[in-house]
Amino acid sequence: MIEPLLLGIVLGLIPVTLAGLFVAAYLQYKRGNQFNLD
């Protein structure tokens, strides 16, 4: 049986991690457009 605390931590970290990756990718995408050296 999964501990409620552990389950809460996992369910709390997953959206934060996905949001962090999305923001990082978005910033890198905008930075790539601003400084396009190709």
Swiss-Prot record:
GO CC annotation terms, alphabetical: cytochrome b6f complex; plasma membrane-derived thylakoid membrane
UniProt GO molecular function: electron transporter, transferring electrons within cytochrome b6/f complex of photosystem II activity
GO BP annotations, alphabetical order: cytochrome complex assembly; photosynthesis
Residue ranges crossing the lipid bilayer per the database entry: 5-25
Keyword Transport: yes
Localization of this protein: Cellular thylakoid membrane
Pfam family, one: PetG
Subcellular location, principal: membrane
Keywords: Electron transport, Membrane, Photosynthesis, Thylakoid, Transmembrane, Transmembrane helix, Transport
Membrane topology value: Single-pass membrane protein
Keyword set includes Thylakoid: yes
Subunit structure: The 4 large subunits of the cytochrome b6-f complex are cytochrome b6, subunit IV (17 kDa polypeptide, PetD), cytochrome f and the Rieske protein, while the 4 small subunits are PetG, PetL, PetM and PetN. The complex functions as a dimer.
Biological role stated in the UniProt entry: Component of the cytochrome b6-f complex, which mediates electron transfer between photosystem II (PSII) and photosystem I (PSI), cyclic electron flow around PSI, and state transitions. PetG is required for either the stability or assembly of the cytochrome b6-f complex.
Stored NCBIfam families: PRK00665.1 (NF001907)
UniProt family annotation: Belongs to the PetG family.
Name of this chain's protein: Cytochrome b6-f complex subunit 5
Naturally occurring in which organism (per UniProt): Synechocystis sp. (strain ATCC 27184 / PCC 6803 / Kazusa)
Lineage: Bacteria, Bacillati, Cyanobacteriota, Cyanophyceae, Synechococcales
Gene assigned in the entry: petG
